[in-house]
């Protein structure tokens, strides 16, 4: 997650449990972030072993300042934790609704959720994708509803044909949008309710124990 813009990229690493190797994390960051955005000035991570070793060595060699947060102090990367939590909430809903199973389906699902959160989240009136690229990203026909794509009949046919991979991806995206609205609204309602939290008015009695 880019702290300034809120731009978020989640990367599929592998199937199974356990901590991934630092080389896997390095390759993922190089392919999915550095390849198009360049090396960041600073990287702040938790204290997981996957964020050390080769990862730190190579990033430091590229002039990146790598910092680990304190022990048991996830609040130091609170924005990253909140974004990650919302992403997982959206993914869980899509996986449950669309019965996503297997490595190939997860690999198709991940970029669709990335696109949705970077398009629909707002920071200063603009989406993270707009802050980073300077424009609204161009998506598949039928997504933006503009005249430029209205004549793309083949793409629209692919969209409604359940046997195509394209239709599968569009179903993931549509479900992810619904899940994002639900998760984002729930978060905003919770913030509004807790913003000025105070005890409920009432006749409270205080008990004294003189024993």
Regions flagged by a language model, labelled:
Residues 4-8:
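Short, glycine-anchored, charge-dense loop/turn motifs used at functional sites
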Residues 56-211:
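Domain-scale segment recognizer with a strong primary affinity
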Residues 34-39, 61-65:
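Secondary-structure transition/capping motifs at alpha-helix termini
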Residues 1, 14, 45-46, 67-69, ...:
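Generic beta-strand/beta-sheet core signal
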Residues 10-37, 48:
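Active-site beta-loop-alpha junctions of metal-dependent nucleic acid enzymes
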Residues 35-54, 70:
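Acidic/histidine-rich, metal-coordinating catalytic segments
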Residues 3, 47, 119:
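Residues immediately flanking
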């Amino acid at each position: 997650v880019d702290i300034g813009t809120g731009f978020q990229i989640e990367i599929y690493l592998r199937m199974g449990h356990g901590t991934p190797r630092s080389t896997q994390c390095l390759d993922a960051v190089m392919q999915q972030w550095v390849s198009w955005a360049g090396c960041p000035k600073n990287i702040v991570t938790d204290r997981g072993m996957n964020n050390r070793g080769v990862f730190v060595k190579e990033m430091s060699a590229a002039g990146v300042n790598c910092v680990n947060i304190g022990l048991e102090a996830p609040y130091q990367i609170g924005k990253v934790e909140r974004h990650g939590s919302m992403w997982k909430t959206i993914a869980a809903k899509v996986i449950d609704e669309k019965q996503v199973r297997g490595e190939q389906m997860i690999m198709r699902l991940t970029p669709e959720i990335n696109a949705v959160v970077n398009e629909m989240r707002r920071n200063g009136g603009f989406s993270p994708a707009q802050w980073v690229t300077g424009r609204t990203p161009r998506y598949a026909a039928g997504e933006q509803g503009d005249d430029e794509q209205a004549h793309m009949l083949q793409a629209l046919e692919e969209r409604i044909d359940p046997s195509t991979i394209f239709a599968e991806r569009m179903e993931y995206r549509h479900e992810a949008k619904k899940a994002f609205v639900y998760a984002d609204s729930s978060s905003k309602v919770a913030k509004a309710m807790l913003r000025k939290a105070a005890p409920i008015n009432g006749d409270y009695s205080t008990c004294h124990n003189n024993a």
